[in-house]
Design a protein with these regions (language model features):
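A short, conserved structural fragment
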Residues: 342-352
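Minor-groove-contacting beta-hairpin "wing" of winged helix-turn-helix DNA-binding domains
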Residues: 353-357
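Local cysteine-cluster metal-coordination motifs and their immediate loop/turn environment
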Residues: 9-20
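Short, amphipathic alpha-helical interaction segments positioned at domain boundaries
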Residues: 359-377
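Extended hydrophobic-aromatic, low-complexity segments
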Residues: 319-320, 332, 349
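Immediate flanking context of iron-sulfur cluster ligation sites
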Residues: 1-8
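Short amphipathic alpha-helical interaction segments
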Residues: 328-342
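C-terminal scaffold of the Radical SAM
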Residues: 1, 22-45, 50-328
Length: 377
């Protein structure tokens, strides 16, 4: 089973923390939709032997498109690929785009999962992050969306300056009041060349506090696990049967094609990525050329990726797989590097699977980096 990711590189405005590829100009929107459809067709040979299980619209802001545009792209996938009968089709959306009419229209055009960028239910947080929606729109869209969609995920951000533990718990409680079956939650991070980075440098916004983010993370984990959510990936929580099939395929090393500017693809042997420039992308597709670069993954690259994705998920890192796929030298190296984390109760081994402990979960990315960064070839 495989997946198709379609990047919609447009947003109404730039969130202060975001460094993803997008444009706030919609002048090339129609041309982009046609180019995306054309790339889907141009790349069908890559997936001729694959069964498509998921279609995911990310961005940017996919909900900025007309539903007819999204429907055209979905139909193009169905016409050119082998797709299972009921694939998971996810559209990332912002609350300000989700009127009742738009929600009903999406539900009537094969979309069966919404991923809604709530981020916070508090007005001051939304203004600090320069989100396009307000608190009332966040609540209203969930009130309506839950009437038409069973499978909904929302994004929440923690570690926001001025966010107390009590305020964070209120955000979680508000989200749960809508009976949402999936929550993705991330610490606010400062990326170079973002407005947030500039504001912190100038002292307009206080520096982020890692300890606060750490506390918020554990409050979230404790609260959601108490009521039956499964913490199946570092930033993702789902009720049983509501895990994101699309994202799970990335973490489990399945093949996927990325369509659109800046989108990445992976087939188990090499990784490729499209140019992060809308004009260059459109020009290349118009010339029937794929605007991508390719990197063949070495054994060490694949080992490192497995360590990173494995430690972020409930599936962990299989020591048996490490030895079978990469060899005893890699396994010996892994066990040597892991010893200090095992002794510090940050990692544990169960049934030949290496996993982070509750204490180690928040630190899993840092732990993973200590387990790779090597070249044994």
């Amino acid at each position: 089973m495989s997946g198709i990711y379609i990047h919609i590189p447009f947003c109404k405005q730039a969130c202060h923390y975001c460094d993803f590829h997008f444009s706030t100009s919609l002048k090339k929107k129609d041309a982009m939709v046609l180019a995306l459809a054309k790339e889907i067709v141009l790349r069908k040979e890559e997936f001729q032997d694959e069964i498509v299980e998921t279609i995911y619209f990310g961005g940017g802001t996919p909900s900025i498109l007309e539903v007819s545009d999204l429907s055209l792209l979905i139909d193009t996938v169905f016409s050119n690929y082998k797709v299972i009968e009921n694939p998971e089709i996810t559209v990332e959306a912002n609350p300000d785009d989700l009127s009742k009419e738009r929600i009903i229209e999406l539900a009537n055009h094969r979309v069966n999962r919404l991923s809604i960028g709530i981020q916070s239910f508090f007005e001051d947080d939304l203004k600090l992050m320069n989100r396009a929606h307000n608190s009332m729109e966040a609540k209203n869209c969930l009130e309506i969306a839950t009437q038409y969609f069973e499978n909904i995920s929302i994004d929440l951000i923690y570690g926001i300056p001025g966010m107390s533990n009590e305020k964070w718990l209120q955000n979680i409680a508000t989200a749960l009041s809508f009976n949402i079956p999936h929550i993705s939650s991330y610490a606010l991070t400062v990326e170079p060349k973002t407005a947030l980075h500039t504001f912190i440098q100038k002292g307009i916004i206080p520096k982020l506090d890692d300890e606060v983010a750490h506390e918020h993370f554990h409050l979230l984990v404790d609260k959601l696990e108490q009521i039956g959510f499964i913490h199946y990936e570092l930033s993702n929580f789902g009720k049983p049967t509501y895990f994101s099939k699309n994202n799970s395929s990335y973490w489990l090393g399945k093949k996927y094609i990325g369509i659109g500017p800046s989108a990445h693809s992976y087939n188990g042997i090499y990784r490729s990525w499209n140019v992060s420039n809308n004009t260059m992308y459109l020009k290349s597709i118009a010339e029937n050329k794929l605007p991508s670069e390719t990197e063949i993954l070495s054994k060490t690259d694949r080992y490192n990726e497995y360590i990173m994705t494995g430690l972020r998920t409930i599936w962990g890192v299989s020591l048996v797989r490490i030895e079978e796929e990469f060899g005893k030298t890699y396994l010996d190296y892994l066990m040597q590097q892991a010893q200090k984390f095992l002794l510090d109760d940050l990692l544990f081994i169960e049934n030949e699977i290496l996993k982070p402990t509750q204490k180690g979960k928040f630190l899993s990315d840092g732990i993973a980096s200590d387990l790779f960064l090597l070249n044994l070839e």
